[in-house]
C-alpha cells in the first residue's frame, strides 16, 4: 500500500532549508531507500518515493512558509544534480506502475509552474552537476535554470538513444513550448545521449545562466534574491500541515463491482473567517480530496468507476465560496484555492470513469459542484423534496482545468447558455439546461443508476481511458494538455512495445552490456 502523506522529519531524499525569502530544496537521494525492492537509487536518481517527498516539501513551502518568495532546487551530491528516474526501477516495474509514476511526476512539475503563475512563488534550478533525463525535466519546470561551467557538467535528455523511450515528464514538450529551443536543435539534443555542456546549453536556450564554479554559489544566491523581488507573497505566520484526519472525504471501495464511492462533505457550519489552521474547512477539504484521489489511483487499479457524491447543506457551502471570494487576496486563500485547483485538475486526468450521483442528501453547490462537472456523466434525482445544484462565481474561473478552460465551459463545449448563479437549480430545471445527463424520478432513479454502473464496468478499461481523455478536454490546447494528451499517450504506448520492454528491448537490456535488438518496422 502506497501512502502519499509524509512529514519532513521522515524525508530520506530531500533537505529543506530556509533563509529569509529563499528556500532551498536539496536533492540528496539515499541509494538504499527505494520505495520497492530490487534497485538502488544511484546517481541521485529518483523513484515514486522521492517524488512523494518533493510533493510534500512543495506544500510545506506553500503553506508553512508564506515568507518564502523563491525556491532554489539543487543537489547535495558532488558533480551530479540528478540523473532522472531510476532506470532499473522502470525496468522492474509493471506497465501500470510506470504510467502512474510518470503521471504523478508530471503533476508535481505542473504544480511548480502553477505556483509560479498563480501564487508568486518563483523557482530557480541550480544545476551543480550532471543533469540528465528526469533531472533536466525537473529543472525545466522552474522559472529559470543556472548551470555550473566546470567542463564536466552537462544537460541531456538521453531516453531515446539510450533507453528507447521518451523523456516522459514533459521534457520534449517544454524544450520547444516553454524554452523555445529551435526544433532542429531540439531533435539533435534529444538524440544525443552525452548531452551538451554549459556554453552550448546557453546558446541553444536550454538554460538561462552560466557561472564558473568559484562564482556559482554566489550567483545562485543573488539570482534567487532577484527572483524573490518579483514575488508578491506577503510573509507572516504560516499554517502547520498536521496529519490528515480524513473526515471530510470518505472513500468506500467495492472491489467486487470495481467501483468506489467518493463522498465529499460540506461543513456543518461554514467558517466565518480565514483561520490559520490545517483544520480550516477549505484547506482540509483540498488535502483530503487530493490524498483520496492518489490513494485510489495507485492502490486500487481495478476499481474503474468512481461515484462522486456530496453531503451537507448548500447554504453552508455557499458561505465558504463567499468567504473565499471576499478574501481572495489573502495568502492562505490564494494557496488553498491553488491546492483545490491542482486537486481538481488531478481528477480531470485520472484514468477512471466518473459518475456524479445527486441523491436526496446531495450538496453539489459552488466549489463542490466542480465534482459534478469533472464527472463523465451525472444522474440527478427528480423528487420533492430533492437535490439541487447551485452555481457560484467559483464555477466560472476559480478552478480552471489544465487547458485553462472552466469545467462548465468544457461541459458545454464552449457554448455556455445563460445559467442562474447563487440560486438552487432543481433536477427538472437542471435537465432542461443540460447541466446533468439524466434526471429520473424517484421510481426510476436507483434502477437507472444501477444499470449505468453495470454497463460502464463491463466495458474495456483501455478503450474507456482513451475515450474519456479525448472527451474531457474540449477546445483549446496548451503545453500541459500536450504533455498529457500527446507526450504521455505516446510514452504509454512505447512502454508496452517490444523495442522498449521486450526481451531485447532497450529499457530491459540497459546496464547489462548487451545491445538492444529492435523491430525496425515504423508504426
Language-model features and meaning:
Residues 1-69, 75-83, 89, 97-99, ...:
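C-terminal alpha-helix plus adjacent terminal tail
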Residues 76-77, 81, 112-163, 189, ...:
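Glycine-rich beta-to-alpha active-site loop
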Residues 108-109:
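Helix-rich "cap/lid" substructures immediately adjacent to catalytic or cofactor-binding pockets
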Residues 137-138, 174-175, 188, 371, ...:
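Hydrophobic/aromatic ligand-binding patch that stacks against planar heteroaromatic rings
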Amino acid at each position: 500500500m502506497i501512502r502519499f502523506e509524509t512529514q519532513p522529519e521522515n524525508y530520506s531524499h530531500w533537505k529543506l532549508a530556509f533563509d529569509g525569502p529563499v528556500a532551498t530544496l536539496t536533492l540528496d537521494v539515499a541509494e538504499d531507500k527505494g520505495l520497492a525492492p530490487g534497485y538502488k537509487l544511484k546517481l541521485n536518481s529518483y523513484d515514486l518515493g522521492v517524488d512523494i517527498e518533493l510533493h510534500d516539501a512543495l506544500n510545506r513551502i506553500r503553506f508553512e512558509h508564506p515568507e518564502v518568495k523563491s525556491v532554489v532546487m539543487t543537489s547535495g551530491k558532488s558533480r551530479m544534480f540528478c540523473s532522472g528516474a531510476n532506470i532499473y526501477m522502470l525496468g522492474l516495474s509493471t506497465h501500470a506502475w510506470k504510467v502512474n509514476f510518470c503521471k504523478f511526476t508530471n503533476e508535481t512539475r505542473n504544480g511548480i509552474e502553477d505556483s509560479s503563475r498563480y501564487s508568486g512563488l518563483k523557482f530557480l534550478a541550480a544545476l551543480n552537476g550532471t543533469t540528465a533525463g528526469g533531472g533536466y525535466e525537473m529543472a525545466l519546470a522552474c522559472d529559470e535554470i543556472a548551470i555550473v561551467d566546470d567542463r564536466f557538467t552537462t544537460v541531456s535528455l538521453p531516453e531515446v538513444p539510450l533507453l528507447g523511450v521518451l523523456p516522459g515528464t514533459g521534457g520534449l514538450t517544454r524544450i520547444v513550448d516553454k524554452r523555445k529551443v529551435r526544433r532542429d536543435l531540439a531533435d539533435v539534443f534529444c538524440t544525443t545521449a552525452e548531452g551538451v555542456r554549459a556554453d552550448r546549453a546557453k546558446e541553444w536556450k536550454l538554460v538561462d545562466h552560466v557561472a564558473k564554479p568559484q562564482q556559482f554559489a554566489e550567483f545562485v544566491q543573488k539570482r534567487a534574491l532577484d527572483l524573490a523581488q518579483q514575488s508578491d507573497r506577503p510573509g507572516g505566520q504560516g499554517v502547520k500541515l498536521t496529519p490528515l484526519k480524513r473526515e471530510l472525504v470518505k472513500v468506500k471501495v467495492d472491489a467486487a463491482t470495481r467501483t468506489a464511492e467518493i463522498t465529499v462533505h460540506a461543513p456543518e457550519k461554514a467558517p466565518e473567517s480565514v483561520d490559520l489552521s490545517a483544520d480550516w474547512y477549505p484547506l482540509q477539504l483540498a488535502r483530503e480530496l487530493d490524498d483520496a484521489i492518489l490513494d485510489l489511483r495507485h492502490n486500487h487499479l481495478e476499481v474503474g468507476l468512481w461515484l462522486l457524491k456530496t453531503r451537507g447543506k448548500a447554504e453552508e457551502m455557499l458561505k465558504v465560496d463567499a468567504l473565499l471570494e471576499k478574501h481572495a487576496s489573502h495568502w492562505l486563500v490564494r494557496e488553498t484555492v491553488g491546492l483545490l485547483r491542482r486537486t481538481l485538475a488531478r481528477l480531470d486526468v485520472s484514468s477512471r470513469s466518473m459518475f456524479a450521483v445527486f441523491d436526496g442528501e446531495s450538496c453539489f453547490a459552488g466549489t463542490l459542484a466542480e465534482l459534478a462537472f469533472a464527472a463523465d456523466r451525472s444522474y440527478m434525482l427528480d423528487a420533492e423534496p430533492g437535490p439541487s445544484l447551485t452555481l457560484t462565481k467559483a464555477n466560472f474561473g476559480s478552478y480552471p482545468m489544465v487547458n485553462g478552460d472552466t469545467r462548465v465551459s468544457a461541459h458545454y463545449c464552449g457554448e455556455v447558455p445563460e445559467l442562474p448563479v447563487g440560486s438552487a437549480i432543481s433536477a427538472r430545471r437542471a435537465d432542461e439546461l443540460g447541466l446533468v445527463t439524466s434526471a429520473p424520478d424517484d421510481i426510476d432513479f436507483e434502477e437507472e443508476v444501477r444499470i449505468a454502473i453495470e454497463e460502464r464496468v463491463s466495458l474495456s478499461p483501455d478503450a474507456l481511458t482513451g475515450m474519456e481523455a479525448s472527451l474531457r478536454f474540449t477546445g483549446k490546447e496548451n503545453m500541459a494538455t500536450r504533455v498529457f494528451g500527446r507526450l504521455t499517450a505516446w510514452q504509454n504506448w512505447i512502454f508496452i512495445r517490444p523495442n522498449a520492454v521486450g526481451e531485447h528491448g532497450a529499457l530491459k537490456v540497459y546496464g547489462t552490456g548487451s545491445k538492444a535488438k529492435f523491430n525496425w518496422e515504423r508504426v
